[in-house]
């Protein structure tokens, strides 16, 4: 069994989603949001994110963490803040010796919905379906669960390829 923590980083709200994977089946564990204080300095917000991720790592002991890659904002200041939030989340996970993988928004949507330009409500719907939830989680938590699901799909896709063929190269016949 593998426990995967998905992280949707943000300087105000960082979503998290935990799933367990066993025999190529996934199940929901927990999800939610780490909300930082609106009036806090950036350094204190980053500390809140770090502490929140460390708490999750201590409580659930995930061995693998998946996080969304940074994308360009129209506002460079927002992109920098997002980069800081992402960085402290990665440091918190790395300090607990977790394997960290990064995925683009397009890869996540493609993996979960089957369409790389899917809308957020489509992603949320598929998270509910795939994890058999009674209702949709909060927006940022749903995104984090989608990131964890993407990681599960990617790691299983690669292990299937490696497992079925090994590392032996085969000659293609024309």
UniProtKB/Swiss-Prot annotation:
Q: Which residues bind Mg(2+) 1?
A: 8, 140
Mention any Pfam family matching this sequence: RuvC
Q: Which coenzyme or cofactor does it need?
A: Mg(2+)
Gene3D superfamilies found in the cross-reference section: Ribonuclease H-like superfamily/Ribonuclease H
**Which catalysed reactions does the entry list for this protein?**
Endonucleolytic cleavage at a junction such as a reciprocal single-stranded crossover between two homologous DNA duplexes (Holliday junction)
Residues that, per the record, bind Mg(2+) 2: 68
E.C. number, please?
A: 3.1.21.10
Asked if the keyword rRNA processing belongs to this entry, the reply reads no
Subunit details: Homodimer which binds Holliday junction (HJ) DNA. The HJ becomes 2-fold symmetrical on binding to RuvC with unstacked arms; it has a different conformation from HJ DNA in complex with RuvA. In the full resolvosome a probable DNA-RuvA(4)-RuvB(12)-RuvC(2) complex forms which resolves the HJ.
Q: Which family does it belong to?
A: Belongs to the RuvC family.
Name under which the protein is recorded: Crossover junction endodeoxyribonuclease RuvC
Q: Which organism is it from?
A: Legionella pneumophila (strain Corby)
